[in-house]
Amino acid sequence: KISLLNASAFEKEVNGKLVSLYTIDSGNGLVVQVTNLGLRVVSIWTADKDGEYADVAVGYENIDRYLNNEGERFLGSIVGRYANRISKGRFMIDSVQYQLPLNNNGQTLHGGLKGLDMRVWNVDRISDKSIDFSYVSPDNEEGFPGTLNIKVRYSVTSENEFKIIYEATTDKPTVVNLSNHAFFNLKGESGGTITDHILTINADSITLVDSLLIPTGEIVSVDGTPFDFRNPVVIGSRINMEDEQLRNGLGYDHNWVLKRTEAKVRLIASLYEPQSGRLMEVYTDQPG
């Protein structure tokens, strides 16, 4: 049985724009609920090996908990304009230095103090299986140069794929790095630890980070390290090993350098939960 969240718990006016909850359905056993506040993935319903449904995306049951940043600010959201950390919030373009607001240990994380995760997005088109969203980030919003026109499509397919497509255009040179910050538990969101999930990542190397989680620029092989997931590994089996990178990340909080193939969109990771029999495969055209 699928217990969809009540849309009325998400209906609210935020900064003069209406926030709501939207549902897309594959028609074949995958139902996804999202809100236009930060394009948050609120729930993903799918069956286990016995046909029992559970919500495998970690999320909140009402909009106020997202607005109040209870717990994890980026829960299920789009992140940007720039995902991950920018050291000291500074970068140079064409000999001009830009300084961004600092919101994470003296760094800029996931777009700054009020990134794309806290913006109310326009809903441009809705069908049973897809939703098109857009947002115009004005020049100098959170310190970033250029007006950024962003379009994002969330869709599901009859093959039970959940797809996210990003598109962004700008009117002057800028930096942009969009991603999604969904959290998954294939036992169901109240299923407890995910350390017994089995993970595979098609990557030979990672980018090292320092103690503030800023990439050092060094790319190192995963050979002989707790970061080697080229063959299926139980997530928790090596997470407590003595390793500087695990210490810096308080576990796994890293970028894997994905293998390139002829195919633009390729399988880069899979996650399997033996108890439920749920398998999630991840495809991308991105490098990490």
Name each model-derived stretch.
Residues 2-32, 36-288:
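An exposed, glycine/acidic-rich loop-and-rim segment of catalytic or binding clefts
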